[in-house]
Amino acid sequence: MSSDNTPSINRRNNENPPQSSLPTTSGIVYNMFPACPYPHVQNPAFHGSVDVPQVAQKAFDPQAATVSESANVSRPTPAPVPPAGNTNTPTTSNSNQNLENNVTSAASMPAILNAAGQLEFSPSTNNALCCCTTVHGHPHMPPNLLAASSARLRLPPISTILGGTFADPTFLAAAAAAAVPHYAHATTGSATDASNTSNGNSNPAAVPAGFLSGYSPLSYAYFVAKANELALANQRQSSEAAEQPSSKNNTSGANPPSSNNQEVTSAPIPAAPIVLPFQQPFYPIVCPGCAQGALPQHIPVPHNTEFAQYQPSSRDLQNHPTVDESRLSSVAPPASNTLNHANGNQAENASESSTSQSNDSQGPANTSYPVSVPLPNDAENNHTLSRNPYIPSLNFKDNMSAELSVVATLASNSAQAHPMGQQSDSNYSDHHNNDKRAHVSRRHSTSRKIAQSHTGSSSTSSAANVRYRCTECLQGFSRPSSLKIHTYSHTGERPFVCDYAGCGKAFNVRSNMRRHQRIHGL
């Protein structure tokens, strides 16, 4: 096979890597990864087995024997062959081999289409599996499918990816992206492939043998991986058919097809654009170790096909929120009848005056509208102030801006719907200003009463409680301490002096002096 436009893999043993052709799909170009920092293994054992019903077993593995529905489907795998020049690859013992025979299911075996259009599994395939699948629990995704800002983010939980099905569109794209074959860490064109070819084993596609063992055959990730694998095998067959004269002279540079490919008809399949049935993922599925130094070169654009359907994301739902009719009805303008509008303004004025009389301790801003009035929605611009993600939340103590916006909206809606109601609006504004003046005067009178009580006024006390009277002004007091403090106002005495160095401030009440000394830290 020709290798003019194919990049190479920098292996750990610093050997000259073989070159292989990589698929170029519609909108997606697969590039090579940097060397994986972790050691590679051959056919790792996945703990646990896959339960496959009998119907699904017959559909995926026609060669399997009849098994009960509750039995675990297991297929034996051959002993792994270490790559050439890699001395760090662990050898598989008898116990490890038995473990692999128990846990490797038919779902982990690559498949191709035969002449009848049925899936055929190749149990003899023995490819290298990237260690990141076993260390991190996640298959790889090419970094060029991710944005530059999200290439170094953490991975989602493996249970989240494995649980992605057609019924869960949120995790559907993540599971699909996780099932993309890892083209960089597959051993192609090495001495290992030559030995596998002589033994009847081959490497028809750069997809690891145990790549799908962590997925259920009925999951969406399994379907996507199978679709990508078939597309890659299809392209390899078309490229081999086009380069058949040159491959006779140089057979070591191309990977021969697997044993199952011999049953496929020799007619070359025309190359067609491959549309991968997944979009740009919601979650970045990439190994942090293999993503170092790798920048995306091409981001896929979803095609308008039956597989790439648009799924609304959470950001789209925030930008286009649903309209709450109850909130709209609470701030809707009054009816079109002029008489009802005038009566509504009178009732509103009465409620405002009663609110201002009952809440004397509150500020004048709280008497205009209650704080619980929701913000209005502009139906013409499809804009919601309270739900705009780019505007900070208005749920703070000072709701003056929210109240003013409500007042302005109600006034504008009333003016547009009722041109004859301008006089009532002006009357309402005059009445509101009068209420504010009266409220300020009441607060001023209350402050005067409080000041008089601090100076020793006994106007609020009854005559029965008066036991002591001032000889100067004849004011009555119930306690002698109050009379003594009052006497200082006539004599001008300040017997309590701050003893802090350099201060010397005098007070007529001891508690006031102690409160002052807190400033000095005493």
From Swiss-Prot:
Residues 84-96, 345-362, 453-462 have a biased composition (Low complexity). Keywords: DNA-binding, Metal-binding, Nucleus, Repeat, Zinc, Zinc-finger. Residues 428-438 have a biased composition (Basic and acidic residues). One of its GO terms (molecular function) is DNA-binding transcription repressor activity, RNA polymerase II-specific. One of its GO terms (biological process) is negative regulation of transcription by RNA polymerase II. Residues 1-25, 61-96, 235-265, 311-386, 413-462 are annotated as: Disordered. SUPFAM superfamilies: beta-beta-alpha zinc fingers. Its main location: nucleus. This is Zinc finger protein C25B8.19c. The lineage of its organism: Eukaryota, Fungi, Dikarya, Ascomycota, Taphrinomycotina.
